[in-house]
Structure formats: C-alpha cells, structure tokens
Amino acid sequence: MSTHTTEPLREQVRARYADAALSVTHGERGSCGSGSCCANEAGFGEALYSGEERGELPDAATVASLGCGNPTAVADLREGDVVLDLGSGGGIDVILSAKRVGPTGVAYGLDMTDEMLALARKNAQEAGVANVHFLKGMIEQIPLPADSVDVVISNCVINLSVDKPAVLIEMARVLKPGGRVGVTDVVAEDRLTSEQRAERGSYVGCIAGALSKDEYVEGLQAAGFEDVSVEFTHEVADGMHGAIVKAVKR
C-alpha cells in the first residue's frame, strides 16, 4: 500500500477505536459498531476470558475488550518476563500480563489512540498494578530498544495494521533472542483471495485486512522467527477464523 492509501485506513481504525473507548468511558458497552471486531459476541470480546480472569479486572477493562482471543492464556508468561502488548486498547491483556509476570516483571501496552491509552491507565490504576507502562505509538514503529522484550502479545490488532511486514520485523527487533510471540488474531483460510476477505467484512472490523494462514507463517519466518504455528480456534466469518499465532525469535 502507498502512504496515500494507508493513512486514511489508519485514521479510520484510530477513529473507530477512539469512539469505542469513549463509549466505555461514558458508561456504555464497548461496542465498536456493526461489522466490527466485537460485533459477534460469541467470537469476540470479554466472553473469551474466564470468569476468574474477569474477576481480576475492572469492569471497564472487560467491557472495552474488543479482541478475538485471550493471548495471556497462550503466551506462556513467566515470573519476571518483560511483556509487550501491541494495540493494548483498554488494557485488559496488559493488566492480566502484569499480574502473571509479578513484581519482577513488566508489562508494556502500545496503542496509537489517546482515548484508549487514557482508559487503559485508569483501568490499571483501579486494578492496582504498578508494573505497567502504556506507550503511545504505532505497532509498525515500536518505541522500545532492540532485544528488550521477552514476550510479544497482541489481540486482534495485527490484522488492522496497514504494513504487516513492518510489524513482524519490529516484533523480531524488540524481542530478545529466544523471545516468544503469543498472539490472537483473525486469520483467513488460504483459499480466500484478498477480494473475498473484503467481501466478508470491513477493514476496521478486523476482516478485510486479515492475513491468510500461509501469509502469517511466511511473514514471521521472513522476519526472523522459527517454530511458527497458526491454529484456528473459532470461525468469525465464512473462511475467517480467530486464531492463536505462536513463534520464537531465532
């Protein structure tokens, strides 16, 4: 995509999720609209977390959850880990990660949306977690040093990026050697063309921009990862699935 094409898309994504954050802040549900990531409650949002996990969180963090999985459940988080959540939204996965890695670990959340960052910081304060840091920026240009992170997580966000190869390369850059990826995302079956994906949902709705399974595997391998796996977990549209994506930095 050219800059002429990508900037309007990025702004559409930013505006959609700013509206979602403001809805939660004003006491409404965290819906981002028909055809969005959270439109199908069976496949998106807070229902994908256990009751025990939801009990650890402020209501605003769970209501604001717009993801397609629970990356903290698949990322093999360990005491003392440094974790980075790409597109951290209202902070649900950052807060859970901070609790998992304990006081010797750190959980970073990166988001480009001021409204989501404000909501996430408020939620983290209410949850009583001190080992969190929320950063403003784009996931294509992560504002952290090389080899500084043990685990990268993300929840239904990479599909929204306008430059996915750059995201995967940045993930490899910030991870330490042997660092791990534990991502949940919408992934297309390989049989679907990009045009067919767009027929099934909008870009800001996490459908049209989704990578295929082969594209994900090949992209991660090209960025410097090994032990790459993409496992479909549930269908969110015809030929489109919530998926667990795992990899290790070479």
Predicted regions mapped to residue ranges:
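N-terminal auxiliary segments of SAM/dcSAM-dependent transferases
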Residues: 1-47
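Short alpha-helix
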Residues: 208-223
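A short glycine-rich, Lys/Arg-flanked "PGG" loop and its adjoining helix->strand segment in the class I
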Residues: 102, 165-180
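Conserved alpha-helix/loop element of class I SAM-dependent methyltransferases that forms part
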Residues: 39-82, 93-96, 100
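Class I SAM-dependent methyltransferase SAM/SAH-binding core
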Residues: 68-70, 78-141
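Core SAM-dependent methyltransferase catalytic element
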Residues: 223-250
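Hydrophobic beta-strand segment of the Class I
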Residues: 83, 152-153
